[in-house]
Amino acid sequence: MTDYLNVGKIVNTQGIKGEVRVISKTDFPEERYQKGAMLLLFQEKKAPIELVVKSHRKHKNFDILSFEGHPNINDVEKYRDGILKVAKDNLAELAEDEFYYHQIIGATVYDETGSELGKIKEILSPGANDVWVVQRPKKKDLLLPYIEGVVTKVDVENQRIDVDIPEGLIDDEN
């Protein structure tokens, strides 16, 4: 069975010419939404639909997409709230020091002394930098900023992340 990764959610239509507004969940919108790219649309309790990107542009905080064979609003209204995905095996190769989010979810985090802190539970993207949520056994989750100087090494193959915790980041009093 093929695994899929979310690249965006269709939140509304845009105009009358078959365009949709997408809240993107990908770090590579230029690649994912390029003309001719194939996306899968998943909707509740329906079989996935293959869509081929006809056009892509940015508008405010949205990616605006149109699809081959869907020239007007009536063709795409039914796709609202659908999730756009790509097959995991269609992902591009990354440089040696780069990784996809899904590759580090579940990785074990170690502090500068080599002590295990917990595992990466999720990744938040609130603004200037990503924040990794580290689930710690019998303690509150640790919100770890993904910035140089804090995350010192990411070993995707061995599922190990080394960090240098800034003073005051861990508050185990609560």
Swiss-Prot record:
Q: Name one GO molecular function term.
A: ribosome binding
One GO CC term on file = cytoplasm
One GO BP annotation is: rRNA processing
Q: Which UniProt keywords apply?
A: Chaperone, Cytoplasm, Ribosome biogenesis, rRNA processing
Boundaries of every PRC barrel domain copy: 96-169
Q: Which PANTHER family would you find in this protein's record?
A: RIBOSOME MATURATION FACTOR RIMM
UniProt KW Cell division keyword: no
Cellular compartment(s)? Cytoplasm
Q: What is known of its domains?
A: The PRC barrel domain binds ribosomal protein uS19.
Q: Which InterPro entries does the protein's record reference?
A: PRC-brl_dom, PRC_barrel-like_sf, RimM, RimM_N, RimM_N_sf, Transl_B-barrel_sf
**Name assigned to this protein:** Ribosome maturation factor RimM
Q: Which family does it belong to?
A: Belongs to the RimM family.
What does this protein's UniProt record list under function?
Answer: An accessory protein needed during the final step in the assembly of 30S ribosomal subunit, possibly for assembly of the head region. Essential for efficient processing of 16S rRNA. May be needed both before and after RbfA during the maturation of 16S rRNA. It has affinity for free ribosomal 30S subunits but not for 70S ribosomes.
Keyword Thylakoid set for record:
no
The subunit field of the Swiss-Prot or TrEMBL record says: Binds ribosomal protein uS19.
Q: Which domain of life is it from?
A: Bacteria
